[in-house]
């Protein structure tokens, strides 16, 4: 049995295929994720699993250099923003973009996976940009 953090085979596969500058998104339950091969639906019920728990687990296995968040999170979900900032290194660049642009990242050619959580707080969506480990 696998010993590392991510046990879900689809998330594990997405992370394994990621190269430098590729993206992986983690989303709340309301994000309109395209129904294609990149969709990884973990939602069981409202707030299960939580966005922040999935993010923390993915960060244990994925080297990132930059994150993208919706500009709207600052006003509409500052608690989630603080939790995200606590999880990531201060060296990681945070880029705030309009929520509509976050939606367009779901179909971006460099995006290797769109994870849907059960999160029901607004603007709990993130795009992780991969870095190299060397």
Swiss-Prot record:
Query: What subcellular compartments does it reside in?
Result: Cytoplasm
Could you say which EC number(s) this protein's record lists? 5.4.99.62
Does the entry feature the keyword Cell cycle, yes or no?
no
Its Gene Ontology cellular component terms are:
cytosol
Q: InterPro entries under this entry?
A: D-ribose_pyranase, RbsD-like_sf, RbsD_FucU
**Gene Ontology MF term list:** D-ribose pyranase activity; intramolecular lyase activity; intramolecular transferase activity; monosaccharide binding
GO terms (BP aspect): D-ribose catabolic process
Q: Where is the active site?
A: 20
Please state the pathway this protein functions in, per its UniProt record: Carbohydrate metabolism; D-ribose degradation; D-ribose 5-phosphate from beta-D-ribopyranose: step 1/2
Pfam families, per database record: RbsD_FucU
So where does substrate get bound? 28, 99, 123-125
Tell me the SUPFAM superfamilies matching this sequence.
Answer: RbsD-like
Q: Which reaction does it catalyse?
A: beta-D-ribopyranose = beta-D-ribofuranose
Known function: Catalyzes the interconversion of beta-pyran and beta-furan forms of D-ribose.
Q: How does it assemble?
A: Homodecamer.
Matching entries from PANTHER family are given as: D-RIBOSE PYRANASE
Q: What is this protein called?
A: D-ribose pyranase
Organism of this sequence: Staphylococcus aureus (strain NCTC 8325 / PS 47)
Gene responsible for this protein: rbsD
